[in-house]
């Protein structure tokens, strides 16, 4: 198959940080900053001194690359599933073609070091919900593609070996999860479904923090969503 890489570099970005919490009966939503004022801790000071960084978006959306049935759609390619012209079932089947056999995380990391990057942020999953690590909480992952290998682990290991701090991007929107709601739940059924999504999200975050202990932080996306 034709292999595509959709790589976006974003410099001097600010991440949001997260820590795994112990078990709890319910998971109340909390939005906004958890601290008041400027942080002065060592981790934040290290971040402020990083300067140049690398932000990589990669997923099954690299296969259409912004094109569908011969038409080019302007805008970010990772949003193509939300466009009316592309059937969702067609997009959700793209993972069956995802087989980047030429992917070389060590080469990426080496090039990043050569260009002077001190940190990188990598998409573990975007809004489509496809996971580039073999999450045990969903089948919509790299493990069920022809490629099968854990992309996140390769990235974390390669960049860490080059002395580059790794932060993991995580979308709090997940179009693939049945419990996700784009707006506040209006019915009891919606509330129950959304509670399963919150638990799913928490489990995946703990999974990432547990399986990739070398990472320096998490970058959350999707906080504009009304849910």
Regions found by a protein language model. Give the residues of each.
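Bacterial Sec-dependent N-terminal signal peptides
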Residues: 1-25
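Mature catalytic domains of secreted/periplasmic carbohydrate-active enzymes
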Residues: 21-227
């Amino acid at each position: 198959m034709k292999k595509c890489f959709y790589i976006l570099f974003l410099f001097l970005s600010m991440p949001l940080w997260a820590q795994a919490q112990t078990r709890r009966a319910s998971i109340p939503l909390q939005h906004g900053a958890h601290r008041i004022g400027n942080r002065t801790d060592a981790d934040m000071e290290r971040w402020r001194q990083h300067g140049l960084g690398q932000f990589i978006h990669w997923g099954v959306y690299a296969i259409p690359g912004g094109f569908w049935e011969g038409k080019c759609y302007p805008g970010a390619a990772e949003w193509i599933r939300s466009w009316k012209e592309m059937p969702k079932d067609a997009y959700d089947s793209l993972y069956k073609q995802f087989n980047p056999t030429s992917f070389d995380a060590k080469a990426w990391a080496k090039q990043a070091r050569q260009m002077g990057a001190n940190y990188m942020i990598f998409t573990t999953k975007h809004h489509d919900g496809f996971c580039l690590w073999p999450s045990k909480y969903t089948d919509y992952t790299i493990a069920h593609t022809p490629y099968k290998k854990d992309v996140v682990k390769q990235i974390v290991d390669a960049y860490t070996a080059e002395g580059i701090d790794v932060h993991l991007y995580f979308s709090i929107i997940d179009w693939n999860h049945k419990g996700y709601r784009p707006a506040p739940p209006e019915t009891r059924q919606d509330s129950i479904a959304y509670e399963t999504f919150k638990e799913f999200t928490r489990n995946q975050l703990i999974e990432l923090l547990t399986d990739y202990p070398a990472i320096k932080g998490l970058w959350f996306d999707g906080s504009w969503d009304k849910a």
